């Protein structure tokens, strides 16, 4: 005999949400004449869908109680007229319902300890089991509370730390230069031979003497920590380097003119300037630019002073040409 099972759902979206489900069943004996019922209540746990509920009722009844099931289904449909709902009715064979009842009875019989006592407890006091379904709904974007989210355990590889062995440094290979390998092995063999003969090994000299260390601390260092060159440091502090090059040559030329004036002061009898004097004066002219000097000669009766104007120009093919005008 077929049994009619009605399924009523008031879900607005097709995507299965997070569900909180409770199942209660009562399995009375057939002698009492009470209908066997199995109800499954599915509650939508979303905040905006807490008002809407899902009721799934499975009723197992005889042909005489078909009218009452039809009335109950009509009541559920009338109560859900305000919200859009869908109602699905299908037929289930009696063998499937009987198999479900037998599996539930066996489970409770194992928990109680004896099969007869477990079946009696089921008939006397109907039990209730609660469980929840976790569905990954991507449409909410993580707005669900933490209680409804699946608790996934993530193992970080940095969280687990393994202690290192104590003899790790001793067993590790030492990488040395290929050219120094033979000398290192020779010294180690010689040291091992002396230790086997119980001979005293001389104390090794320190890597750096203390005086050298103190001297290194006193030496000036640059920004990168390297030692500065003292010669370059002295050249940078030399005051002559601060003067421009033309000014240095001008001071040298002035000293030459003073020497020429002293030489001419010894000859007091001269009244005119010879050609050789003019030539010597031309050598002392500044070769790097235009200059004008005043030279005082020895006093004479006709010309008490002598003016020498010198001009040099090195722009003509790299040769030095001199132009002088002597006023007596």
From Swiss-Prot:
Subunit: Heterotrimeric transcription factor composed of three components, NF-YA, NF-YB and NF-YC. NF-YB and NF-YC must interact and dimerize for NF-YA association and DNA binding.
Organism superkingdom: Eukaryota
**In what ranges is there compositional bias, type Low complexity?**
57-75
Which terms does the record give in the GO molecular function aspect?
A: DNA binding; DNA-binding transcription factor activity
- GO cellular component annotations of the record: CCAAT-binding factor complex
One Pfam match, given by its short name, reads CBFB_NFYA
Q: Where in the cell is it found?
A: Nucleus
Q: Does the keyword Transcription apply?
A: yes
The name this protein goes by in its record: Nuclear transcription factor Y subunit A-8
Coarse class of the protein's main subcellular location: nucleus
Please list the coiled coil stretches: none
Identify the species of origin. Arabidopsis thaliana
InterPro entries the UniProt entry points to: CCAAT-binding_factor_CS, NFYA
Composition-biased stretches, type Polar residues, lie in 76-86
Tissue distribution of the protein: Expressed in the whole plant, except roots.
């Amino acid at each position: 005999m077929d049994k009619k099972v009605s399924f009523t759902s008031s879900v607005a979206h097709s995507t299965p949400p997070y569900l909180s489900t409770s199942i209660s069943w009562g399995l009375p004996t057939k002698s009492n004449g009470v209908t066997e019922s199995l109800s499954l209540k599915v509650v939508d746990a979303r905040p905006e869908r807490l008002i809407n509920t899902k009721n799934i009722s499975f009723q197992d009844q005889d042909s005489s109680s078909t009218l009452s099931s039809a009335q109950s289904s009509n009541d559920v449909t009338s109560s859900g007229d305000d919200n859009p709902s869908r109602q699905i009715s299908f037929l289930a064979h009696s063998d499937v319902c009987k198999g479900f009842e037998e599996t539930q009875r066996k489970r409770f019989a194992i928990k109680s300890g004896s099969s007869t006592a477990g079946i009696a407890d089921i008939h006397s006091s109907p039990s209730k089991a609660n469980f929840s379904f976790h569905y990954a709904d991507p449409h909410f974007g993580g707005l669900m509370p933490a209680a409804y989210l699946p608790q996934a355990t993530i193992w970080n590889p940095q969280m687990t730390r393994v202690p290192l062995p104590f003899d790790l440094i001793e067993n590790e290979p030492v990488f040395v230069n290929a050219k120094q390998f033979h000398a290192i092995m020779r010294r180690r063999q010689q040291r091992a031979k002396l230790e086997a003969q119980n001979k005293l090994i001389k104390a090794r000299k320190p890597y750096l003497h203390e005086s050298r260390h103190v001297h290194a601390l006193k030496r000036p260092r640059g920004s990168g920590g390297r030692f500065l060159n003292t010669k370059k440091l002295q050249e940078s502090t030399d005051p002559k380097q601060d003067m421009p090059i033309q000014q240095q040559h001008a001071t040298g030329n002035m000293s030459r003119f003073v020497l020429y004036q002293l030489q001419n002061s010894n000859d007091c009898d001269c009244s005119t300037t010879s050609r050789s004097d003019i030539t010597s004066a031309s050598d002392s002219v500044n070769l790097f630019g235009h200059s004008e000097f005043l030279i005082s000669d020895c006093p004479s009766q006709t010309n008490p002073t002598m003016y020498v104007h010198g001009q040099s120009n090195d722009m003509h093919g790299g040769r030095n040409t001199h132009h002088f005008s002597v006023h007596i």
